[in-house]
Design a protein with these regions (language model features):
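ATP-dependent phospho-/nucleotidyl transfer catalytic cores
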Residues: 1-42, 53-54, 149, 153-156, ...
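Short, surface-exposed acidic
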Residues: 13-14, 110-122
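Amphipathic, well-packed alpha-helical segments that form the structural scaffold of globular domains
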Residues: 21-25, 46, 79, 103
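Conserved acidic
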Residues: 37, 90, 94, 114, ...
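Secondary-structure capping and boundary motifs in well-ordered enzyme cores
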Residues: 37-42, 63, 67-74, 78, ...
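Catalytic activation segment of kinase domains across protein kinase-like and atypical kinase folds
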Residues: 46-84
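Active-site activation/catalytic loop segments of kinase-like enzymes and analogous catalytic loops
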Residues: 68-110, 126-146
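ATP/Mg2+ or Mg2+-diphosphate-binding catalytic cores
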Residues: 124, 129-171
Length: 171
């Protein structure tokens, strides 16, 4: 992480960089906090990876770019999507309602979940986008444009973690 912190200095806020240092220092506790129920997770679930089409008043959605697929709790994709899709202020204003709709959708499909359980998972997986910013930034060729994008991801998802007090769930 020190090389990432150096790379993001001046592009990501100091508190966001400190957050990453604390996350890395407590990564084993973070993984130990994972719930045991897993599903197929995209792990890069954002608007850029959704294709929409409309025909005869029906809307279809296709999800693309499955290179990071894995077994994770479903709330990890939910937290990543919400954190990546909204401005910080819009996320703050809408996230509880969106998580409630997510829970209602699962329950309607006979996947019994409670809002409190999913909300706790959503808070824990506020880390999803932040971790992706760290990992992806070292896997691709470094460019100024890429650094700006990964710093923006770290800032947005880091603020999500701070707002949700994610660290309290594993530190």
């Amino acid at each position: 992480f020190p090389s990432i912190a150096e790379r993001f200095t001046g592009k990501a806020g100091d508190e966001i960089i400190s957050l990453g240092e604390r996350l890395v220092a407590n990564i084993e506790r973070y993984y130990a906090a994972f719930p045991s129920t897993l599903t197929v997770a995209h792990r890069d679930f954002r608007l850029d990876n959704l294709l929409f089409s409309a025909r005869d008043s029906e809307i279809a959605v296709k999800v693309v770019d499955w290179q990071t697929v894995g077994a994770m709790p479903g709330a990890s994709d939910l937290a990543y999507f919400i954190g990546a899709s909204f401005t910080v202020e819009d996320r703050r204003n809408r996230e509880q309602a969106l998580v409630k709709i997510y829970c209602e959708g699962l329950n309607a499909q006979q996947v019994a979940v409670s809002f409190n359980d999913i909300w706790a998972q959503y808070r824990l997986f506020g880390t999803s986008g932040y971790i992706m910013a760290i990992v992806a930034s070292v896997l691709v060729k470094q460019t100024d444009r890429g650094d700006a994008m990964f710093a923006a991801m770290a800032n947005r998802h880091g603020q999500q973690m701070l707002d949700l007090e994610t660290e309290k769930l594993f530190v």
